[in-house]
Each structure stands twice: as structure tokens, then as C-alpha cells.
Amino acid sequence: MEFAFTEEQQQLRRSVREFAEGEIAPHVMEWDEASHFPMEILPKLAEMGLLGVIFPEEYGGAGLGYIEYALAIEELARVDGSVGLIVAAHNSLCSNHIFKFGTEAQKKKYLVPLASGKAIGAWSLTEPEAGSDAGGTRTTAVRNAKGWVLNGAKTFTTNGHYANYCVAMAVTDKTKGSHGISAFILEKGMPGFKPGKKENKLGMRASETSEVIFSDCHVPPENLLGPEGEGFAGSLKILDGGRISIAALALGMAQGALEAATKYAKQRKQFGQAISEFQSVQFKLADMATQVEAARLLVYQAAWLADKKGVRFTRESSMAKLFASEVAVRVANECVQIHGGYGFIKDYPAEKYYRDVKLCTIGEGTSEIQRLVIARQLLGKK
């Protein structure tokens, strides 16, 4: 059993860390307060291969695996969770759905520009009335002579406001429940397809989250993604990989919060000494560090399994996502506490970690849903 990363993986970590600290860190609060992500940074992310990490080179990707992908997301999120989230949604959800279920023609038309960074992707499953109950989708797709007509709305779509391509689920047969849901590829500018309200969020503010609306949106037949009626089942498989990226996202922010708390504790002086000399603070830091390392093991175990052909990793990805996200919330909370009053001030990074990490216990399946997934796997239930 080998716990060390390869030299190539360590070099990737160093490269992404250098990029994040040099290109992202100086702008974190500016982007957060503006609730806007500058698209001009995307070519730089693409140049590093971060917009197509897990896809073969023949489709414009970097040809790497989930371990490298998790490393990249962790390092981006250590500096800014919003950037990590943008990259994660683009790779794990939209692009990966096309890679896993698309025809060769669809991969060449859509995956190549997505993986090479010439386009940005979004993925729409959640609806105003269908959150954890994703099988309760109400958006419809009705077949006609020219293909399909979509009507409905999705919510909480990461990258929805500026995505070039969007993979969305819609009901194609109301009599079949979740087996009547299909996936479609939408293109920016298609008549009847547009972004809706941009959400004003607690955290991850530089990652733009919005509604997407379908109003008599005509979709050609070749934009059906995967077999008709298999969109929901496909989505569940896509979420297995997506949860690894959210786990890595949480891990990165937890690591960042731990480092911020440690740095502050060594610098802040009270009663004539650094607060790091007080046992109560030392105990907090020790617990934080232990939890972060435990989360790291779960995250990279899941990533390792995802890189193995034919191995199911549903339980492990849910475990990693559940544990890492809840650890991140606890660590960020302690980071604020160690900072004291300054933890409540935007001049320090503690409050942003505190706001950002909460999403990880909600997005791509709440902590409660993860516990259900894990329990069903343990009990042998479908």
C-alpha cells in the first residue's frame, strides 16, 4: 500500500498552488464582493489543462486521472472555493456527462471545446420543486418532427449565466417516473434557452449560480444525450464522480482555513505571548489538523478507486463528500473562533472560508442524501 503521490502528481500540486497564489489570491475578495468571476482567467486555467483534466488528449483533455483532478481542485479551493467550484462543475458534471454518454459526434462537437477551454459548461438537474427529489423533475421535452421542444426551468446551476453548453434533464415520458427522464445538450443562443435569475448567495459568490429557463426551446434530435429515458440513471453515475470533486473542494478549503488559523495563532499576542502557546488553542489546531488528514485519506481513496476501470465507487465517493464537507464546516468554524473578533472581519480570510464551506454539505447531494446513499450500499438496497 502506497500513500505517497508520484513526482508528477507532486509537480502538478506545486504548479496549481503557484498559479492559485499568484493569479487568484490577490483578487479573491474583489471577485467575492462583486459576485462575479472574470472570464479572462479561463484561458490560463485551460493552458494548465485544468478544464479537461480527466479527459483523453484526443478530446482536448490532459489525459490525467481523478487523483490529479482532486489535487487540482484541492489546491484551487485552498485559495478560493469559487474557482474550484467553477472548474469542478465544468469537468465533473457537464463535460463528464458528454464524455460518458455522448456519441462520437457529440464528443467531437462539444467535449473538445470544453476540455480544451474554448467553452465553459453547465449542468442542470435541480429544479425549484425537485431538489433532493431529483426524480421529481417537471421540465418536459416533447418530441416533434424536428426533434424536441423543452419547457420548464432549472435552478442552482453553476456557470449557468455564462456557459456555452449546458447538459439538462427533462421528462420525456411522464408514465415511467425516473425512467422517463432524458438528458439533452443545450447551446448558448438556442431560441427559447436563456439564463434566469442570478442568485445572491451566502458564499462561493464569485461562482455565478443561476436559473436556466426553457421556453419552447427547440432542440435537434442529435442533441439527445444518451438513450431516451436514461438521463436520470446517467446523472446518478455522473454524481459519483462529481462528489469526489466536491469532497476535494471541501478538503482544499479546510486546509486553507487550518493554515490561516495556524498562521494567525502564531502571530497574535495576548497576555504577553502568542495565542498558539495556550493549550486551548493548541487543542483546537490539533483536532482541526487530524480531521483534515482523515478527510484527505477518504478523498484520495475515492479518487484512486475512480481511476480503476470497472470498479464501483458510489459508497466511497459519498463517504468522502459527507465527511470532508462536514469537516470543512467544523474547521472553518474553529478558524473563525481562533481569530476572535478578527474572524468576523473581511480583512482576514476566516470569514470567507466560513461562508464558502457550507455549500459543500448541500451541493451535489446534501449530507442527509449522502447518508442515505451510504446506508443503502451497506444494506444492499437499490
Language-model segment annotations:
Residues 138-140:
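Short, surface-exposed charged micro-motifs
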